[in-house]
Amino acid sequence: MKKEIYNVEGIEIEVEHIDKNDADRERRLIAYQFKTIREQAGMNRKDFSDWLGIPYRTMQEWELGRRQAPDYVLRLIAYKVKMEKERGNL
């Protein structure tokens, strides 16, 4: 299957192709990107939510695609993960 590569604040995310006509495409794409960023940080959901100061339930719903994280929040979190990795804090 065709894969698409997205770059979110310097973190490359490879995603299986999601049909452009899929009504839930954007929500599913952001959910997958959010999960990938968390995995890049090397944390489980609980640790990641504590580290970011985001309620666990909110983060879980973003990651499962039940709610859509705002795009700017995804970019800010990706930036924080990238910077903390560069500083050696992750």
PLM segments and residue spans:
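N-terminal flexible/basic segments that precede or flank functional cores
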Residues: 1-28, 78, 83-90
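Alpha-helix N-cap/N′ positions at the starts of helices
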Residues: 29-30, 54
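Positions in alpha-helical segments
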Residues: 32, 36, 57-60
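Short basic helix-loop element that most often maps to the first helix and adjoining turn
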Residues: 33-47, 76
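Short alpha-helical DNA-recognition segment
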Residues: 42-60
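The DNA-recognition helices of helix-turn-helix-type DNA-binding domains
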Residues: 55, 66, 80, 84
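Short, basic-rich loop-to-helix N-cap that marks the start of a DNA-contacting helix
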Residues: 66-78
